[in-house]
Amino acid sequence: MGLCKCPKRKVTNLFCYEHRVNVCEFCLVDNHPNCVVQSYLNWLTDQDYDPNCSLCHTTLTQGETIRLNCLHLLHWRCFDDWAASFPPTTAPAGYRCPCCSQEVFPPINEVSPLIEKLREQLKQSNWARNALGLPVLPELNRPVKNIAPIPPPPPPQVKHVSYDDSPAQKEIPIHHNRSETPATHLEMEDTASYSVSNSDVTFARKKNFASESSSDTRPLLRQDRDADNEENKYKRRPTIDWMRGLWRAKHGTGVPEDRTSGRKMAIFVMFLALLALITIITVLKRAGYNGEHSSDPMFDPMANPNIRVAVDDSRLPHL
């Protein structure tokens, strides 16, 4: 369980693998539509994730996506084609996630932002409307693809070559008559690349994620994020972080900080310090504390025998 960092501050067990933060269902729908999100316990067990679609094996950022009730993310077009291949008489329970075999259609009495968005996306296809008991719309019918017939291959052409026993042809070596083998190219799943000395065979190793550009140097996480690493994850937060959290909850983090906002923050801190000082002094005064040496007789001038104080007597003449 964790606390989402949005202004709603909801307790959630969902965790974004790409941004490494706890997210509630509201943030999942609004701010993380194409991110890989699973439970926090799964993140603690295994931190590896695949940013590609499980059906077409391409990156999820290419095209519209759909998030099922089991939190698995797929391309909407791939999932629509996959589900439309089922027979029309398939029951709603027969449509299951291709990753975990959990039912695609959520229960009727279950309500959440994620499920509401899922139902709205499923209503865009007639196979889902039929399973949900909704009327089928003609404008949502899938177009029939006209497959052009493949023409038969042309018959092989045989060339008639005449051979003669000329002396020039006898000088050709024996191995020259063998047909030349074309170069063979193999692709292996790894990150290294090498080639052997034989010029006919070339080995090339392919990257695991060929769709991603190797020149992309954008950081995965922001530099000013609140990193929940292993060192300070369960430590007690200082007071300044608590005050900064209240400030962000009220004013947000989207507005860039300028000198005016920093000055306001400094004035606010000085005001709190002055208020705390006045409160401490008032409490000490009401408790009767007048200083460290207020009850020490050594500092009482009337108890010192070397100090003589004139007593006001009416019998003594006044000078």
Swiss-Prot record:
InterPro entries: ZFPL1 (IPR039043), Znf_RING (IPR001841), Znf_RING/FYVE/PHD (IPR013083)
GO CC terms in record: Golgi apparatus; membrane
Transmembrane spans: 264-284
Annotated S-S bridges: none
Keywords carried by this UniProt record: Membrane, Metal-binding, Transmembrane, Transmembrane helix, Zinc, Zinc-finger
Zinc finger residue ranges, RING-type: 53-101
Topology with respect to the bilayer: Single-pass membrane protein
Region (Disordered): 212-232
Zinc finger (B box-type): 1-43
Family from the record: Belongs to the ZFPL1 family.
Protein name: Zinc finger protein-like 1 homolog
Originating organism: Caenorhabditis briggsae
